[in-house]
């Protein structure tokens, strides 16, 4: 299920304000060299398109494509018209051997919960990749149990969960 904050244009417009600038994100520092070395890139769950916009601003001259099911987020992404933005999910597209690199940043992969969802997503990603293509993603490590620190952090900010 897509959260309302990602579909509502007014809320999606605020999303990037709550994130570090793309040039200061550790995950983007990891992903950007991968994007820059790939001819054609698909960002699954691209959100507002910050990573693809950074790649284009950094000189990527090839094909950049963002896929996201949240229309509000894509409306923000579409501020950059030299990148293809697709409204949908992996089940709604049928790319065949079109991308050198597929990425899923910001823990987007953890949206797949059930085994059949994971298998279907991986099959769609594999189909979208050219021979020798790469898939890069990250997800939270449940063994770290980061959520246990959240109440303390939120309380220190004078807020509540």
Locations of regions flagged by a protein language model:
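A conserved beta-strand element that flanks and buttresses the S-adenosyl-L-methionine
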Residues: 103-105
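Class I SAM-dependent methyltransferase SAM/SAH-binding core
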Residues: 49-92
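Conserved class I S-adenosyl-L-methionine
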Residues: 1-45
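SAM-dependent methyltransferase
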Residues: 138-161
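A short His-aromatic
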Residues: 110-112
């Amino acid at each position: 299920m897509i959260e309302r904050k990602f579909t509502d244009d007014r809320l999606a417009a605020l999303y990037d304000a709550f994130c570090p600038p793309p040039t200061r994100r550790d995950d983007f520092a990891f992903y950007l060299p991968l994007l820059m070395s790939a001819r054609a890139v698909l960002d699954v769950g691209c959100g507002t398109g910050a990573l693809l916009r950074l790649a284009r601003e950094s000189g990527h001259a090839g094909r950049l494509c963002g896929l996201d099911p949240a229309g509000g987020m894509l409306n923000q992404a579409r501020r950059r018209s030299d990148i293809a933005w697709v409204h949908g999910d992996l089940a709604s597209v049928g790319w065949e051997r079109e991308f050198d690199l597929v990425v899923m940043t910001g823990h987007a992969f953890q949206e797949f919960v059930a085994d059949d969802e994971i298998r279907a997503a991986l099959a769609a990603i594999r189909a979208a990749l050219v021979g020798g293509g790469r898939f890069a993603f990250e997800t939270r490590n449940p063994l770290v149990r980061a959520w246990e620190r959240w109440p303390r952090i939120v309380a220190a900010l004078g807020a509540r969960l």
